[in-house]
A protein has these predicted regions:
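Short cysteine-rich clusters marking metal-coordination/redox-active sites
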Residues: 6-9, 26-29
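Cys/His-rich microdomains that often coordinate metals
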Residues: 13, 33, 73
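Short linker/helix segments within small regulatory modules
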Residues: 15-24
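A short beta-strand-turn-helix
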Residues: 38-57
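Thiol-based oxidoreductase modules, predominantly thioredoxin-like and allied folds used
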Residues: 41, 61, 76-99, 106
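Short pre-active-site segment immediately N-terminal to redox-active cysteine/selenocysteine motifs
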Residues: 54, 61-65, 108
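Conserved redox-active cysteine motifs that mediate thiol-disulfide chemistry
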Residues: 61-75
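Non-catalytic, surface beta->alpha helical segment in thiol-disulfide oxidoreductase systems
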Residues: 108, 113-144
Length: 144
C-alpha cells in the first residue's frame, strides 16, 4: 500500500498496490490524486506533498521571469504526463516562495531536486531539453 498526499486538499491517502494508482481518488475531497500535470507547491503545501508521499518527488524550482525555466516548462509538463503515477512532479515558484528557495539553498534556476521519503537525494541545476530531462528523471528516480 502506497501513501500519497492529495494535491488539492493535502489529505494523506493510502493507495492499494493492486489497484491502478492513476485512477485513485482522494478519500476526503474526491479529487484525482494524479492528473498527469505537475503540481504547484507553495510554502504551505510543500512539506505535505513531499513527506506524505511514498513515491519519488521531483521539484522544479523556477521563476516566472526566467527564460530557461519557461523554455523547460513544456518538457516538464510532458514528463509529468509520462511518469505519473510512479513519480510526482512539483513546481515551486521561487519568486512567490522565497522561503523554500532559501531553505533548500537554491542559487540558480531552474534547479531540479529529487526527494524520497522526505529527504533530498539529488539535484541538477540548469534547463534540459525534453528527452534529456525525461532520461535524467528516470535515471535518478529508479534508485530513489
Amino acid at each position: 500500500m502506497s501513501q500519497i498526499a492529495c494535491p488539492q486538499c493535502l489529505a494523506t491517502n493510502r493507495v492499494p498496490e493492486d489497484k491502478p494508482a492513476e485512477k485513485a481518488r482522494c478519500g476526503s475531497c474526491k479529487a484525482a490524486l494524479f492528473d498527469r500535470h505537475p503540481v504547484e507547491a507553495d510554502e504551505k503545501s510543500f512539506d505535505t506533498l513531499v513527506n506524505r508521499t511514498d513515491i519519488p518527488v521531483v521539484v522544479d524550482f523556477w521563476a516566472p521571469w526566467c527564460g530557461p525555466c519557461r523554455m523547460m516548462a513544456p518538457a516538464y509538463e510532458q514528463a509529468a504526463a509520462h511518469l505519473e503515477p510512479d513519480v510526482r512532479l512539483l513546481k515551486v515558484d521561487t519568486q512567490a516562495n522565497p522561503g523554500l528557495a532559501a531553505r533548500f539553498g537554491i542559487r540558480s534556476i531552474p534547479t531540479l531536486a529529487v526527494f524520497k521519503d522526505g529527504k533530498e537525494v539529488t539535484r541538477q541545476a540548469g534547463a534540459m531539453p525534453g528527452p534529456q530531462l525525461l532520461r535524467w528523471i528516470e535515471s535518478v528516480t529508479a534508485y530513489a
